[in-house]
Amino acid sequence: MKRTIFLIVIICVILYFQYPHINELNDTFEILQYNNPNKSIFENMLNEKKISIFTSIPIELEFNGILPEYFTKDFTQTLQNNKEFKNILNQNLEYYKIPLSVKQRTNISYFENSSNLIYQNNYRFLLINLNNTIKISLFNPNQKDNLYFNSSNKSNIDFHNADYEKYPKLNDVKFIEILLHKNQMISIPYKWIYILNKYEDQDSLLLTYINESFFSKLLKK
């Protein structure tokens, strides 16, 4: 009985200190960058909750003798439900798994059209560019109201082609744009907003990795 009470107290203490860290937001546009970091450096960078870019990411996704830079749209589509390829994805991304992971999801997509505003509600969200270059517009959580998000965390604004007279709050929006090149990975912080855009009319191959820990799944707002 005493042991059970002791364990409950320990768990409560851990949760108490984890809660503010899990829900802490960093609104700065400062960017951290590192070349192929070791696990310790990687985790320390993500714990700062800033935009983080990692270069020279060693992703090996050759499948049936085809390298990612030669994946076509149709071929990429056939990989969506391919268990063998999913295993390859998981093996490549195991290194970036959050400690005490209880949820993870991978997806590979052939990117050919710019996206609308996307609200990032996962605790750890990694985006890897496998081919060419992609442009990413990033908005911190404070910009949410100015971007006309609704209660479902969605916005119907076409930001780069919007009518600023119809949506006057857009005049106050602050954001940055970055270029993510081949074999580079970005960590988009929790509750940030982003848009993916083609760069110089290039199609890209994107790999996303979503991860939640026991604590983030339980405690995040």
Predicted regions and their residues:
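N-terminal accessory scaffold of Fe(II)-dependent oxygenases
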Residues: M1-I186, I195-K221
